[in-house]
Amino acid sequence: MFNDIPVFDYEDIQLIPNKCIITSRSQADTSVTLGKYQFKLPVIPANMQTIIDETIAEQLAKEGYFYIMHRFDEDSRKPFIKRMHEQGLIASISVGVKACEYDFVTSLKEDAPEFITIDIAHGHANSVIDMIKHIKTELPETFVIAGNVGTPEAVRELENAGADATKVGIGPGKVCITKVKTGFGTGGWQLAALRWCAKAARKPIIADGGIRTHGDIAKSIRFGASMVMIGSLFAGHIESPGKTVEVDGETFKEYYGSASEYQKGEHKNVEGKKILLPTKGHLSDTLTEMQQDLQSSISYAGGKDLDSLRHVDYVIVKNSIWNGDSI
C-alpha cells in the first residue's frame, strides 16, 4: 500500500549548500516560536527520567530553552507548576491518559501550565483524542502537544481534535526497542516518516527520536519539523538525573527508555532498554555546541534563520555519508 513512499533516514541524506549571505555564523538566528513563546533553539531534551528533572527544567527555562517535564512523578507536577510560575517561568508538563489524569487536568484551572504534552507510545488512539478535547475544554489557553504518531492520518486526527502540535516518531530512539518487540514503528525511516507526516500537518510537528548528530537537527527542519526532541545527545551529562556508575575507573550515566522495566518498575509490556553512556561534561556546553552547529547549518543553507533550512535541496546517498567512518 505504501510502497511508493520514499524510504530513508538521517544517515541517508545530505543537504546541498547554497551561497552564504552572512559574514559570520554568529549572525544566524536559531530561535523558534512555539505558541506564544520564543525559544533559543528548536530542540527539546526528551521528557524522560534520565534526561530531565526539576532542576534541569528550571535551568532550561531560565536560559530561554523549551523543555517538557516528564510525567513519572505525578504528585510533584502541581507544586512544580506553582514553583515555576512564582519565578516567572513557563510551566511545561506531561500527562498520560488514565482516568485519574482527567481529574488532575481539571484541578489545574487555578494555575494552568503554559504547555501540556500528552505522552504515550501510540498516540493515534481514541484515548489521546479524548484527552486533547478534555484539556482544551478545561484549560483553553494551554498549548497542547500530543503524540507519539507516525502517519499523516494520525497527525490530522490529533490536530482536528484540538492538538496545537504533534510529536512524530515511534521507536526510532536509541533506548527504544518498539520496532523489535512489536514489528511496528518509524525506526530506520524516521526522517521519511517525518516528511510524510509534515505534508499533512497544518500545525507544528515535533520530530522525536533517531537524532544521533547535530546535523540531524537541520535535516529534521528541512523535512518539516518545527522542533526536535532528543534523548541520547542530552543524556550522560554531569547534571543528568541518570544514576552515575563507575566501570573500570571510567564514569558512566544510566540512560533508559520510558517503556523500559527500569522506568515501569516491572517487566510488563517492555519496549525500552537501559544503556550506560560515558559522562560527557555539562549540559550548557552541549547546548552551546548545538547552537553553533545549527548556525553553521543556516550559513550553508544560504540564509539567516531556520526557515532557510526548509528550502535547500538534498540528495539520498543510502548509508554512505560516513564513508566507513564514525563520529
Curated annotation (Swiss-Prot):
Active site: C176
Classification via InterPro entries: Aldolase_TIM, GMP_reductase, GuaC_type_2, IMP_DH/GMP_Rdtase_CS, IMP_DH_GMPRt
Catalytic reaction(s) noted: IMP + NH4(+) + NADP(+) = GMP + NADPH + 2 H(+)
Keyword field contains Magnesium: no
Matching SMART domains: IMPDH
Enzyme Commission numbers on file: 1.7.1.7
An annotated GO BP: purine nucleotide metabolic process
Keywords: NADP, Oxidoreductase
EC category: oxidoreductase
MF annotations from Gene Ontology: GMP reductase activity
Residues that bind NADP(+): 205-228
Short name of any one Pfam family annotated for the protein: IMPDH
GO cellular component terms listed in the entry, alphabetical order: cytosol; GMP reductase complex
Family annotation (NCBIfam families): GMP_reduct_2, PRK05458.1
The family this protein is said to belong to: Belongs to the IMPDH/GMPR family. GuaC type 2 subfamily.
Protein task: Catalyzes the irreversible NADPH-dependent deamination of GMP to IMP. It functions in the conversion of nucleobase, nucleoside and nucleotide derivatives of G to A nucleotides, and in maintaining the intracellular balance of A and G nucleotides.
PANTHER family: GMP REDUCTASE
Stored HAMAP family: GMP_reduct_type2
Protein name (record): GMP reductase
Name of the gene encoding the protein in the UniProt record: guaC
